[in-house]
């Protein structure tokens, strides 16, 4: 641990926030339907999509219609992706001859990519063909990300509205975000990745002879194109089982830097766009400050813990002051720490190291970031509306303390909004703790678990936290490709995505119908340090109190076991 490591973490976080501002201003223009510099090329394509699909771009939808459109689109996406995975053996671009996925694995994988989770219970390079990767998984990396940003746009319009029922048009938002934002950025980033050494090919796997004279199969895929949207859309599912620790997905420190920035930049950009459209830029800066504080603290804790000696190495009298187990030497501890904080705070789930090999507090911090709600800065779109839900609860608490009806950005926050907000917030602990409790006692779940005790419980907790939080990363350490794990994790992903989105859209519909109030001397300020502190407190209380007993039995107990081992 040295000053260069701290400087690296600060630089990457600062660069990400800085790049979020211009992207946020561009995103605001998309949400408003304003003209952009891409219009001469993409406007005809946009009109063609509307005409082919029978979409009226002038029609605004109520919150229930918007939610139904989102659910219908997601259901159709699930059916299509499930069919591709099941029929993979009969589809083209499959030179390896991979068979179709079993029903429970296809179910889990289809839900995973439709819900923007990208949990993978399989070894990608030995299971999924190039066609399934491109037509199935990569395309849904775009669509699931665009759907999340569309919901954020609807929530933003609710705060800008004055006694209105419409939240915009889901199909228009989905189309514009995909065409004008995700696709152009992904093309540029993919070309950069190819230039930096990532493969982009449809060729079959190559057999090579190693220096030891052993035959080795080298998997080849169109990696760069999926890697670009994988990180930009906070998807996280990799072409290779090692994910971004694999040299084909993340060959050098420069690609590592780009991928970290990709993970968080659109999360910050959504908040910037929100502030511009609601005319609340100072309030947006307050939200960004909260997000950046959590990412910085998490990265610092992980960096500190992972530069401690590993007890196994100390016991073997090995000279190792840093826990480099499961980490890539080409990145080092600082880049691994900021990556881990970014990927768990952003619902991305892509990894450049193996979290199961982290020290207990390092892995516990990664898990805690997910359990806080994936709002720091969160997934594309979902981070913004998740933070708005907690901001509403924060101003409600402030209103109770001073005896006034709470307001947030000119909208009264009343019982209806608070009930919907609490319904959304409770989805996470109910699914995580409920499924984890069942998995900890049922033989059908435990039979695939390789570790027992505190670490085994941590692996179970992390799996359901990752699935419900739509993150997708894993501690691993157990066989996830079984009917129990594939089914229950799939259900957890559904609850975490759609069980949260529907109450959020209901809140948006309720707020849009209310009058826009003017700020008075009695209005609680939501752009200063007092609100920032209150919001941090609400986030910690909701995350800490709900999950602390479970964390105490998992990573915290394991930490003290490590201290005991080091003291011997």
From Swiss-Prot:
Domain of life per record: Bacteria
GO cellular component: plasma membrane
InterPro entries in UniProt: KdpA
Alphabetized GO MF terms: P-type potassium transmembrane transporter activity; potassium ion binding
Membrane topology: Multi-pass membrane protein
Keywords on record: Cell inner membrane, Cell membrane, Ion transport, Membrane, Potassium, Potassium transport, Transmembrane, Transmembrane helix, Transport
Cell compartment(s), UniProt: Cell inner membrane
Transmembrane segments: 7-27, 65-85, 135-155, 177-197, 254-274, 286-306, 383-403, 422-442, 489-509, 530-550
Membership in a protein family: Belongs to the KdpA family.
Subunit structure, interactors included: The system is composed of three essential subunits: KdpA, KdpB and KdpC.
NCBIfam families: kdpA
Function as written in the Swiss-Prot or TrEMBL entry: Part of the high-affinity ATP-driven potassium transport (or Kdp) system, which catalyzes the hydrolysis of ATP coupled with the electrogenic transport of potassium into the cytoplasm. This subunit binds the periplasmic potassium ions and delivers the ions to the membrane domain of KdpB through an intramembrane tunnel.
Protein name (Swiss-Prot/TrEMBL): Potassium-transporting ATPase potassium-binding subunit
Species this chain originates from: Beijerinckia indica subsp. indica (strain ATCC 9039 / DSM 1715 / NCIMB 8712)
